[in-house]
Amino acid sequence: VNKVKRLLKQLKCPMYGHRFGPKKYKFYENIVALLIRYYCRLSYRRVVYFLDLLGIKCPSKSALQYTANKIKSEFWNRLLELTSGAKHEIIALDATGFSRTNPSYHYLRRIDGKIPKIYVKLNTGLSILNRKFCAAKIRIIPAHDIKDALALLRKVNTRKVVADKGYDANYLHEYCFSNNIEAHIPLREYGKSKHKNWSKRRLAAKHFDKTVYHQRELIESCFGSVKRKYGSSVNSKKASTIKSDIYGRLVCHNIFYYFIRVLGQSHANRNFYIINYNIFINSD
């Protein structure tokens, strides 16, 4: 609760959700309840019942749904920026999908049912050094990965970026060249170049480093971590609540990352992560 209060204070958020609305619950109480819901994989009714059992003041089910519907993507991206850090040495770009529902595919095959194909597309950037998500873009209707790459890079401060062949676009390399960012993206070969003046993507291919590029695999590992901990499907129906659901899972990953790393570590590493986690929690 104190960590959420500090984050909202740094974002200069108002005390209440709306200046003309009722002043019964403060804004941080809604955010805490939503983050607990995402972390524990509960429904709106169950998280209200769970917090009531613990004696924690919590808004009603409909109030939580209203808050999740009204929160904009800019707010969640600012939370990701605060919980991941200001500067990043290497950023990895990649995309993954979340299914709309969680059906039993075994049952669907047995009854010759139709396999659902529409999913939610998550395009995000991960800081390689601290394994935290620093920017994200969610599309309810899937689109190509490259369409969100430039918007993600504009939100972060980095020196190097690694991505797969799907992000090999000349305008992305031009942006990296103008902002002194090293782009390690494998070249998509369409055949021999017809022009003598090489494009920025072919100039970047001359400095391509496989050692740096293979660090991109860490973002796929973090995708698996998020889906195992918080679920690989979303139960929300509206576009705004679906986005809040996925953004909240990324914020939970950033906040509880140090604590999760303690499990399964040696005694020396465990003490190191405990000290850093306490510094992170108590930081203003």
Identify the residue ranges that each predicted region occupies.
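Basic, amphipathic alpha-helical segments enriched in Lys/Arg and hydrophobic/aromatic residues
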Residues: 205, 209-284
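Basic, low-complexity segments
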Residues: 1-20
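DNA-binding alpha-helical recognition surfaces that contact promoter or target DNA
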Residues: 49, 66, 224
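Helix-centered, glycine/charged polyanion-binding patches within enzymatic domains
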Residues: 165-233
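A generic secondary-structure boundary signal that marks alpha-helix termini
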Residues: 42, 56, 73, 192, ...
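Polybasic low-complexity intrinsically disordered regions
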Residues: 18-39, 45, 49, 73-182, ...
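Major-groove recognition helix of helix-turn-helix-like DNA-binding domains
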Residues: 57-73
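A short, basic/aromatic helix-end/turn motif that makes direct DNA contacts
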Residues: 50-54
